[in-house]
Amino acid sequence: MMSAASTAPVASTSALPGSRFVPIERFGAVMGLATLAHAWLLAHAQYHAPWLIGALLAALALLLFVALGLRTLWQWWRMPLRVRAEWAHPQSKPLVGTLWISLLLLPLLLAPANMLAARVLWGIGALGALAWAWHTLGSWLRGRHRLASINAAWLIPVVGVLDIPLALPALRWVPALTPLAAFALLFGALFTPLVSTLIFARMALGRALPPAQLAALLILAAPPAVASSVLRLVFPALPMLALGVLLLAVFLLVLLLPQFARDSRAHDFEAAWWTLSFPLAATTVAAQLNTPWGGFAGLCLALLLLALTSAVVAVLLLGSLRLFWRGSRAR
């Protein structure tokens, strides 16, 4: 999701000889895998889909999170200047939200096995998401940003706050924390249109996006998808509103997926394209939760999205393995 311009300040800092810097945005893969795992576990409960698929995806998401978490801590220890530069740059700063979102999504998978661990992870993720949204939005209000520095990743801090209520039912914190869920929805309702307007202005008036940022546009579909799930899980008395917000997410996917498919043909696979996975998986989960009100069409939509998201994640996994293999051979 970071362009060459965005990585310039980071690349200019010193690094250890032979070391390879792993950007914070790689936690986006954890987001996609964890949400798709949740979708398959829901499919097991609703349609008797194979439980093993969801379990394997959940294990992969947890292992990847641990690996990336350890790598991030190592980089803070050995390359602090480089990490600080990444966390401070206007284009990469919002991507830090992928870490907090991962911490908010993993409790959905952990809660049935270890409620205490799930609640601890959720608490860290919720505090981190709120603090980082406050910090990031404050930095935008101070100005001095260029149109070229705006990209769809600017929505990630907003999505982070919206994700806070998702695990509340699994953690058995409804209705105790229902006001927090209402705050998250209102936060998203306020800031999603504002940031989306900036992103559309960047697309209409700015230069073409670099290859690494092409998939980031699909983040525009994430806020309505997450909001629809929150409405169904925490505010079930508003089924039509949840269904309408889901349809908005589907519309945005239909609008943006063909554009990504067209623009990405001329480029090699980018690890940053994992950005595709979370909006697709989040919309899939929202469609599954709204199936009782969508009728047969809603069921078909949920199954279609589950198949599409699974296929996309499979392609992303294969592409990532190829990149890893090439990198290993190059060394």
Segments predicted by a language model, with ranges:
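Hydrophobic, membrane-facing alpha-helical anchors
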Residues: 2-19, 67-82, 128-142, 188-203, ...
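Structural signature of hydrophobic alpha-helical transmembrane segments
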Residues: 55-67, 116-130, 179-194, 240-251, ...
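Juxtamembrane helix-loop boundaries in multi-pass membrane proteins
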Residues: 10-39, 58, 79-105, 122-125, ...
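Internal transmembrane alpha-helix with an interfacial aromatic "cap," most often the third helix
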Residues: 109-112, 132-145, 163-176, 191-208, ...
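Extracellular/periplasmic helix-loop-helix junctions in multi-pass membrane proteins
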Residues: 45-52, 175-178, 235-241, 262-268, ...
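Membrane helical hairpin/interfacial module
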Residues: 47-115
